[in-house]
Amino acid sequence: MGLTPMMRQYLEVKESCKDCILFFRLGDFYEMFFEDAKVASKELELVLTGRDCGLEERAPMCGIPYHAANTYIGRLVSAGYKIAICEQLEDPSASKGIVKRGIIKIITPGTYTDSSFLEENKNNYIMSFYLDDNMCSMSFADISTGEFNSTHSNFKEAVVLDEISKFAPREIVLEENIKESFIHTIKERFPNISISKIKEENFDYNIDNNLREQFNNFSENEYETIVKKSANGLLYYIFHTQKNILSNINKIDYYSIVDYLTIDVNSRRNLEITENLREKIKKGSLLWVLDKTNTAMGGRQLRRWIEQPLINKTPIENRLNAVEELLNNISLQEDLKEDLKSIYDIERIVGKVASKSVNAKELISLKCSIGKVPYIKKYLSSFKSDLFLNMEQCIDTLEDIHKLLDKALLDNPSLSVKEGNIIKEGFNEEVDSLREAKSNGKKWIASLEQKEKEETGIKSLKVSYNKVFGYFIEITKANLNLVPEGRYIRKQTLSNAERYITPELKEMEEKILGAEEKLIDIEYKLFTEIRDFIEENIDRMQKTARIISDIDCLCSLATVALENNYIKPNINAKDEILIEEGRHPVVEKVIPKGEFISNDSLIDTKENQLILITGPNMAGKSTYMRQVALITIMAQIGSFVPAKEANISICDKIFTRIGASDDLAAGKSTFMVEMWEVSNILKNATSKSLVLLDEVGRGTSTYDGLSIAWSVIEYICNNKNLRCKTLFATHYHELTKLEDNIKGVKNYSVSVSELENEIVFLRKIIRGGADQSYGIEVAKLAGLPSPVINRAKEILQHIEGDKEENSLNITPSKEYKSKDYIEVSKDTLNTKNNLESEIKHDTLSETNTATIIEDESIKEHLCSNKKQIQCKKNNEKSIKKELAVDSFQINFEHIKKDKVIEEIKNIDILNMTPMEGFNKLYDIINKTKDID
């Protein structure tokens, strides 16, 4: 048995889009077959059926109504699938054989433009990447808005990952032979990004002609060849999927990576620039605080400003001056914001114009939006700052487009452009004439109905219409005896009625339907002419849209500054960051008003180059460091900042090493990740950079960690090519001695108050180093059981008392019912490597529940002494010969509620924001109140 003609056609089409789910149009449905059907039925929760196709077994099949396709397509694209739309290319009724079909569009995560599935305040970027020896280029496009950006640099994975993190593309287009290890790295860091591959030749083919035809501002001698390749590859992919050239992509914007403040992937995450650390949502981020925009365009632009802070003093100060002028003209600012609220998403509407998918209602939204532009231009003329004056000169009021739309389109047109009811009366004589004929015909129908009711005496008689039978007279069966014989021609019999026609009725039907059909055709033709005129002027509307989005951003920054009592920072060239009474912009928004403790900061490249911060955990060191970085970023985007006074030097890069989770899947421990991040910072930071280092060396033994932290500080301060402004938080109090030995190191600590054996974190950063870490007190605040806290204090006293003796003796408390006795003789301990070769490993008792204590002071002694470790157990048959070098174990059988302890052990505090830490602490305290 051979394949059916339809199935043969399906397989031929499928061959050209193997990586897509094929939506194959059959009548009023899109059908999917074979593996596509299995995937779609699972993802969309559709019933999987079968169809005879000429093979031995029925082909798996499922389908969806074509008019509801957008919803299903959106769900599949959101899940990362590509969809190929195969349409009927001819009228089935006019086709003698099998209907001609072809793919009209391929929808991918990076080329999807349905506004119902796009975030209005976030771009939907697609990226291309091209690698040539040691150089690479990247291009980013959003086909829904028409943006197209390109850059190039020396190839470093870190640089590429930073740009991916900045633009957050939904899809990346790569050359098909690129190394799989590089693709693996991308997928590992960004698992939700879709990867697509094209041939090498698609990056090169007809490169200059393609770019010249697409971009109004393209000059072949202006761009490096490698830049043109990534741009050409991306244009090829867009054309391949959209099946036409998009006129809204008409300008290529080249940017240099070094023209903006570099914030690497880890720093964007740690500083919570656009999403919070834990939930990966906007709330709790810097963007969340600063975004008071009134338009979708402004929301996207503000995100770009925050993702790409400036490093040139003049544009920064231009923005700051504009924000200041808005704050000095509150009434004018409010009028401006009120008009902004009435502006729709101009960029995405004209994007739909370019893709021929715009409807009449969206053009009415466009009309209403550009109708506000003359008022905005008038407001701009009232300002004096350079930025606003330039905007006032450049903004196009688009009055000709507004006039056309206002004259041509009904205020409330049909949603579908192929159903008529679009064109306004008086715009076209033929439309008016046909509408009159249609109206007169319907009046005739109404008069016919009244006449028949009167002449037959049937009050329930109706003249109705449907698409199958046209116009007809309907009479219920109860009244059939009243119908005069021979008056009507029977057309259809229903269960409770009869339907009739008359020659006169059918004649009028032809006139009415002819007028309606012709009217719909003419209205659609006029609509396409209007759409084409708008398409010819897309670049004008895009320029105006960009100015409106900039105005919206400035108004947003002014609103936030007013609401939160921000001040205008001074931008200096002294390599000095001086902040008086600075506040963390996010934390102060999520705690009760007035409770945030402000702090001063002074960092430069001379006497105050490295600020060494000591103090207990949870006291606010990390919050303070993040606060300095966020204030710097805010200043460089042109925002006012949360402080009493701020003098900010422009930074070229911001690096952070704050917390890390074990990357076990990649075979990297916390310490390995930490060292990799520190290495990256030391290799790439400059004297213009701001570096935040938190607890460097914490992931290894005390002496190793202390040595590494010490060496890092020396390298930063003594390397003439580095000397970056640095905030360095540590629990190694020994490092405070470096202030006397290394120029530029200054000791600071978090103030703590002790009252009746209780500690209170004052959150105030003060001059001088801390003399202790208060680790046990922090554990007590976290809700650890009293026996654990008391025993820890005993152990600490032993350790501190034995510091000047030759041995460390710790006898376990009897209340733990432990038989272990641990004696560590300081004179006989060897180094960690020697110990590991001398001690045979065994297992600890499996009958007891063990809790690991990793006290750094204990580990210090265990790793540095040079004698044999002896573990004696009174009730055991043999002496255990294994003792972990980096920790020792104590049994806690008496603790009944070990689930709470297990929860404490599993807290990933390194990846918590300060506010999340406080909430977790409160939760643990409540859970442990009943534990003795």
Curated annotation (Swiss-Prot):
GO BP of this protein: mismatch repair
Quote the InterPro entries the UniProt record gives: DNA_mismatch_repair_MutS, DNA_mismatch_repair_MutS-lik_N, DNA_mismatch_repair_MutS/MSH, DNA_mismatch_repair_MutS_C, DNA_mismatch_repair_MutS_clamp, DNA_mismatch_repair_MutS_core, DNA_mismatch_repair_MutS_N, DNA_mismatch_repair_MutS_sf
CDD domains of this UniProt entry?
Answer: ABC_MutS1 (cd03284)
Q: Does the keyword Acetylation apply?
A: no
User: Which molecular-function annotations from GO does this UniProt entry contain?
Assistant: ATP binding; ATP-dependent DNA damage sensor activity; damaged DNA binding; mismatched DNA binding
Instruction: Give the residues the record marks as binding ATP.
Output: 615-622
Can you tell me which family this protein belongs to? Belongs to the DNA mismatch repair MutS family.
This molecule's function is given as: This protein is involved in the repair of mismatches in DNA. It is possible that it carries out the mismatch recognition step. This protein has a weak ATPase activity.
- Which HAMAP family does this entry report, sorted A to Z? MutS
Q: What is this protein called?
A: DNA mismatch repair protein MutS
Q: Which organism is it from?
A: Clostridium botulinum (strain Loch Maree / Type A3)
Origin organism lineage: Bacteria, Bacillati, Bacillota, Clostridia, Eubacteriales
